[in-house]
UniProtKB/Swiss-Prot annotation:
Organism for this UniProt entry: Human papillomavirus type ME180
MF GO annotations: DNA binding; structural molecule activity
Subunit architecture: Interacts with major capsid protein L1. Interacts with E2; this interaction inhibits E2 transcriptional activity but not the DNA replication function E2. Interacts with host GADD45GIP1. Interacts with host HSPA8; this interaction is required for L2 nuclear translocation. Interacts with host importins KPNB2 and KPNB3. Forms a complex with importin alpha2-beta1 heterodimers via interaction with the importin alpha2 adapter. Interacts with host DYNLT1; this interaction is essential for virus intracellular transport during entry.
Cysteine disulfide links: 21-27
Keyword hit for DNA-binding: yes
Localization terms from the record: Virion; Host nucleus; Host early endosome; Host Golgi apparatus
Post-translational modification: Highly phosphorylated.
Keyword DNA-binding: yes
Purpose of the protein: Minor protein of the capsid that localizes along the inner surface of the virion, within the central cavities beneath the L1 pentamers. Plays a role in capsid stabilization through interaction with the major capsid protein L1. Once the virion enters the host cell, L2 escorts the genomic DNA into the nucleus by promoting escape from the endosomal compartments and traffic through the host Golgi network.
Cellular component GO terms, alphabetical: host cell; host cell endosome; host cell Golgi apparatus; host cell nucleus; viral capsid
Protein name: Minor capsid protein L2
Pfam families reported for this sequence: Late_protein_L2
Gene it is expressed from: L2
Keyword field: Capsid protein, Cytoplasmic inwards viral transport, Disulfide bond, DNA-binding, Host endosome, Host Golgi apparatus, Host nucleus, Host-virus interaction, Late protein, Microtubular inwards viral transport, Phosphoprotein, Viral penetration into host nucleus, Virion, Virus entry into host cell
Placement of sequence motif Nuclear localization signal: 1-12, 450-458
Length: 469
């Protein structure tokens, strides 16, 4: 919107005011004193002129022109120059009588009168004679080239007075070839300079600034300050404010109205909505979230007052419309995606530092449920659940001395199963066995050394060598 400045009217002069207000008696005192010459300066000149002659000097309250005769130098009178107007030749005046014609002819009359072109006469009765002719030879153009070859030659002349000394071969006037780029060789050695090029960003830690003056900190774009004390807050409940905001300011119904730009209006006396009175500008919309709602906002500029210079004075109003509310997020219980592993009593650990309990029943159960594999070791269920919570229990595995699983720290041993492939014997199996004893020595299973049901009495040796049972 282009604001038009109001034309400033010139104030009337003191002389014009004196002519109009003197008759009505409403003239200000300064106007009367200035026109009538009764100001303090005029009175001082009148009083001082009684004893001092100031005539001809032009001392007064008027313009400094030196009086009617101007300034006269002290040395004498100024030289006067008399302007003589150039003499003009007299104009001959011819008297015109009442009988003279009023039409002035530009060309003099001549005594020769032409009769013009003679009219043709026809003597016969048959009219004009028409003569016709016919030709049987076809109009064929002979485009066969004549016998003989065409030779193209070119001649060039070298003039040293008009030739550049750096050019060896003068360019020809024309060439008969398909190449449109014609070059001219020059004489001399063309010098060049090798400039070493440096590769940037090959050394460094990668934290060097990209620009010469990096901006410290993180720069954020400031949002619109719509809720300051300088903005008047007005809530618009009608949804047409989002799609047709001009319907609240003017009565016009435009065919196309952009809703995402700044809208400008002419100041109107009456607005369809009293909240939009004196609105001359609606800024582009902004979507914000305020107290759990999605809010559509526009800032309007009012033109309530206009100065003589054309400046608009008005408040800034924040118009907003709450579109919808933001519901709180629902808490969803997450389920594990991996099925829990089944605990196997054969893959547990045994706590040797647990308090003394009836281990006989536990060892018997583990012995009968044990499955001997190729690793030749067995694990028993842990008794840590029955231990007191005041002790820090340490768990170690129990197995054979030659194949002991290593478990460091509070690691959890998960069950591990190996696939069992079906074995097909090549020959029929004979179920009858022959037991052959090769000697008197035998070995018990290593597991039986640890799974004794009764306590074994250990001999005590004294210092004198006697064994006590």
């Amino acid at each position: 919107m282009v604001s038009h400045r109001a034309a400033r009217r010139k104030r009337a002069s003191a002389t014009e005011l004196y002519k109009t207000c003197k008759q009505s008696g409403t003239c200000p005192p300064d106007v009367i004193n200035k026109v009538e010459g009764t100001t303090l300066a005029d009175k001082l000149l009148q009083w001082t002129s009684l004893g001092i002659f100031l005539g001809g000097l032009g001392i007064g309250t008027g313009s400094g022109t030196g009086g009617r005769t101007g300034y006269i130098p002290l040395g004498g009178k100024p030289n006067t120059v008399v302007d003589v107007s150039p003499a003009r030749p007299p104009v001959v005046i011819e008297p015109v009588g009442p009988t003279e014609p009023s039409i002035v002819q530009l060309v003099e009359d001549s005594s020769v009168i032409t009769s013009g072109t003679p009219v043709p006469t026809f003597t016969g009765t048959s009219g004009f004679e028409i003569t016709s002719s016919s030709t049987t030879t076809p109009a064929v153009l002979d485009i066969t080239p004549s016998s003989g070859s065409v030779q193209v030659s070119s001649t060039s002349f070298t003039n040293p007075a008009f030739a550049d000394p750096t050019i060896i071969e003068v360019p020809q006037t024309g060439e008969v070839s398909g190449n449109v780029f014609v070059s001219t060789p020059t004489s001399g050695t063309h010098g060049y300079e090798e400039i070493p090029m440096q590769v940037f960003a090959t050394h460094g830690t990668g934290t060097e600034p990209i620009s010469s003056t990096p901006i410290p900190g993180v720069s954020r774009v400031a949002g619109p300050r719509l809720y300051s004390r300088a903005h008047q807050q007005v809530r618009v409940s009608n949804f047409d404010f989002v799609t047709h905001p001009s319907s609240f300011v003017t009565f016009d119904n435009p065919a196309f109205e952009p809703v995402d730009t700044t809208l400008t209006y002419e100041p109107a006396d009456i607005a369809p909505d009293p909240d939009f009175l004196d609105i001359v500008r609606l800024h582009r919309p902004a979507l914000t979230s305020r107290r759990g709602t999605v809010r559509f906002s526009r800032v309007g500029k009012k033109a309530t007052m206009f100065t003589r210079r054309g400046t608009q004075i008005g408040a800034q109003v924040h118009y907003y419309h709450d579109i919808s509310g933001i519901a709180p997020a629902d808490s969803i219980e997450l389920q594990p995606l991996v099925a829990p592993e089944q605990s196997d009593p054969m893959d547990t650990l045994y706590d040797i530092y647990a308090p003394d309990t009836d281990n006989t029943t536990v060892l018997d159960t583990a012995f009968h449920n044990a499955t001997f594999t190729s690793r030749s070791h067995i694990s028993v269920p842990s008794l840590a659940s029955t231990a007191s919570t005041t002790y820090a229990n340490t768990t170690i595995p129990i197995g054979t001395a030659w194949n002991t699983p290593v478990n460091t720290g509070p690691d959890v041993v998960l069950p591990a199963t190996s696939p069992q492939l079906p074995l097909t014997p090549s020959t029929p199996i004979d179920t009858t066995y022959a037991i052959t004893i090769y000697g008197t020595n035998y070995y018990l299973l290593p597991l039986l050394f640890f799974l004794l049901k009764k306590r074994k009495r250990l001999p005590y040796f004294f210092a004198d060598g006697i064994v006590a049972l």
